[in-house]
């Protein structure tokens, strides 16, 4: 079923240059936009003197790193070849032969989307939709199987749930304590509240 769904999506490639370009853009560049949004939330926290924004941005980066480490561990245990290794596919974005499972692009974008939920619910919804398009694009361009993307989302939803339930408030409080000490020591107190 994984291969059938892969073929269904990947066979859409190389039929329309505009759609191919959009999928390549989502696959290659949208993850950087997600990172930039997180940095912007942090900068807004400085400019508007809102510690909560800085905490949210830090917490989002923290859970994203945790999820990427989980991916690294899974990839080192379960190597899954990319679709183009054993089959002829419509490969729009060349990639090395590193393990395909789970998708780092899907993991990173969904981690950021869910992490920024406390900042702005509408932004979270928009970024979640964009993350799903990123995941779809990874299959469309020939770099991932659908299961790589779907299971990446499952991992992110599970870790985010646990993180929000047990760790998020502790991480944000620790950030606040460290920030206050650093800003006092570095005399940047005027930049913060």
Predicted regions and their residues:
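Membrane-embedded catalytic cores of phosphoryl/pyrophosphoryl-handling enzymes
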Residues: 94-193
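Hydrophobic alpha-helical bundle signature of multipass membrane enzymes
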Residues: 1-96, 111-117, 122-134
